[in-house]
Amino acid sequence: MITFPNAKINLGLNITEKRPDGYHNLETVFYPIPLEDALEITILNDSKQKFVLHQSGLEISGEPETNLVVKAYLLLEQEFQLPPVDIYLYKHIPSGAGLGGGSADAAFMLKLLNEKFNLHLADEKLEEYAAILGADCAFFIKNKPTFAEGIGNIFSPVDLSLKGYQLVLVKPDVFVSTRDAFSQIKPHYPDHSLKEIIRRPVSEWKNCMFNDFEKSVFPQYPVIEEIKKELYSKGAIYAAMSGSGSSVFGLFSPEEKITKMDFEAAFCFQTELK
């Protein structure tokens, strides 16, 4: 049984306050995009092992036990006594890009196990399991445009469609430490909530919807800021960094037929949003 975990982008990201536990409260809008990994599981005949992880595509660092798809399997295996499995993960979503690739893999693994082994878990229960694995993992259970607050784990639906818009996503060969990005942030409450801004026409977003991480990341990694500027110079009506970076995306008008763009970057993805 195979599934295709997809990435997300952040539309706006406001860091509103630092919490007593050391984490930060924020508000952002998660929007799913059709940049996908591939994930497959089969029954493992060698019952001496709980799982075997087969990885291909983009390189992933760390031991198999640290991979979120494995953590997702072990979480349900412990409760439902699942059989041993072969896990095949093909990575197309870059890591460390602010695209939620690892979180998507984990959430889709939960959904895949639920379907394959007839666990009959409702979405709400799957979201509870996903939240154990990571703050934004639960978003990928329903996988629809969502307003997120708290530490990125309190969700409410957003009536938003970017169907027809052209998306250009660029990730330079740069790794941004999320911890370092947070350390430079001065939390503040914005004048207008993203819940209100997201209802405005996309053509107005440039001047009112921001990613607070850009203030700390751009001075350290000028190449990321240059990509954002280049997207605007090529005609994007809105461009921003996703999450804490290092990827940057641009939205182009449905009326504008754009050709394939080239960037001096490690990764570039271009598609029409459906």
From Swiss-Prot:
Keyword ATP-binding on this protein?
Answer: yes
> Which GO molecular function, any one, fits this protein according to its record?
4-(cytidine 5'-diphospho)-2-C-methyl-D-erythritol kinase activity
Catalytic reaction(s) noted? 4-CDP-2-C-methyl-D-erythritol + ATP = 4-CDP-2-C-methyl-D-erythritol 2-phosphate + ADP + H(+)
> Catalytic residues?
K8, D136
**Pfam families registered for this protein in UniProt:** GHMP_kinases_C (PF08544), GHMP_kinases_N (PF00288)
The EC number(s) this enzyme carries = 2.7.1.148
* Gene3D superfamilies referenced in this protein's UniProt entry, alphabetically: 3.30.230.10, GHMP kinase, C-terminal domain
Keyword set, alphabetical order? ATP-binding, Isoprene biosynthesis, Kinase, Nucleotide-binding, Transferase
Q: Binding residues for ATP, per the UniProt record?
A: P94, S95, G96, A97, G98, L99, G100, G101, G102, S103, A104
User: Top-level EC class, please?
Assistant: transferase
The pathway this protein participates in, as annotated, is:
Isoprenoid biosynthesis; isopentenyl diphosphate biosynthesis via DXP pathway; isopentenyl diphosphate from 1-deoxy-D-xylulose 5-phosphate: step 3/6
Which InterPro entries does the record match to this protein? GHMP_kinase_C_dom, GHMP_kinase_C_sf, GHMP_kinase_N_dom, IspE, Ribosomal_Su5_D2-typ_SF, Ribsml_uS5_D2-typ_fold_subgr
Q: Does the keyword Endoplasmic reticulum apply?
A: no
* S-S bonds: none
Q: Which GO terms describe its biological process?
A: isopentenyl diphosphate biosynthetic process, methylerythritol 4-phosphate pathway; terpenoid biosynthetic process
Q: Record's SUPFAM superfamilies?
A: GHMP Kinase, C-terminal domain, Ribosomal protein S5 domain 2-like
PANTHER family the UniProt entry points to: 4-DIPHOSPHOCYTIDYL-2-C-METHYL-D-ERYTHRITOL KINASE, CHLOROPLASTIC (PTHR43527:SF2)
What is stated as this protein's family in its record? Belongs to the GHMP kinase family. IspE subfamily.
Q: What does this protein do?
A: Catalyzes the phosphorylation of the position 2 hydroxy group of 4-diphosphocytidyl-2C-methyl-D-erythritol.
HAMAP family this protein is in? Answer: IspE
* Protein's name according to its UniProt entry: 4-diphosphocytidyl-2-C-methyl-D-erythritol kinase
Species name = Bacteroides fragilis (strain ATCC 25285 / DSM 2151 / CCUG 4856 / JCM 11019 / LMG 10263 / NCTC 9343 / Onslow / VPI 2553 / EN-2)
